[in-house]
A protein has these predicted regions:
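Short, structured beta/alpha segment
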Residues: 1-117
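Glycine-centered structural positions embedded in regular secondary structure
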Residues: 57, 159-160
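Long amphipathic alpha-helix in the N-terminal Rossmann-like dinucleotide-binding domain
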Residues: 65-74, 94-109, 123-150, 154, ...
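Alpha-helical hairpins and coiled-coil heptad-repeat segments
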Residues: 116, 120-124
Length: 160
């Protein structure tokens, strides 16, 4: 049996994704340096018609200056525990996480397809993996809410 791209159902075929942006200091910046190609172990015909790993896309090949810029931005954001995120009110932090989950859910199909290609999970297992991840984040949010509620309660001890 020979494998051909045409044998892969259209809804599961992929086009390479070019990732030429990176996040530093709350800003998406355009990467102009070298990139690294990301391949699937699933083989499809290459330009010469020979079976080869399938190109999924490219990612920035972050070099020392960009990495140090990211480190400096992280230090600035944290500010020894006095930055925006560590001092943000619980409700605001939870809202950020809930927004992240909703945005992630909007990309479910795309992420599931990439899981299938990148780590060779079948469709059903890829959906389960995605859904488990969402459930874990939601459960963590709920756990944090419960922890915050417990911390806001006062216990009476000895009538006081």
């Amino acid at each position: 049996m020979t494998n051909k791209v045409t044998e892969i159902p259209k809804e599961f075929q992929v086009s390479p994704i070019v990732c030429d942006r990176y996040l530093v200091d709350g800003e998406l910046k355009t990467w102009k340096g070298n990139t690294t190609e990301v391949y699937s172990t699933i083989q499809t015909p290459n330009q010469e018609g020979k079976l080869a790993p399938t190109l999924l896309g490219t990612i920035p090949d972050m070099e020392t200056p960009a990495a140090l810029e990211a480190l400096k931005a992280a230090e600035k954001a944290y500010q020894r525990g006095q930055g925006i995120w560590p001092t943000m009110r619980v409700g605001e932090r939870l809202k950020c996480m809930e927004t992240f989950v909703e945005k992630m859910k909007a990309h479910r199909e795309e992420i599931v397809k990439l899981l299938m290609w990148e780590i060779c999970k079948n469709k059903s297992d890829s959906y389960k993996e995605f859904d488990r991840t969402i459930d874990y984040i939601v459960d963590t949010i709920e756990g944090y809410k419960n922890l915050d509620r417990k911390g806001a309660k006062f216990d009476k001890q000895g009538g006081v």
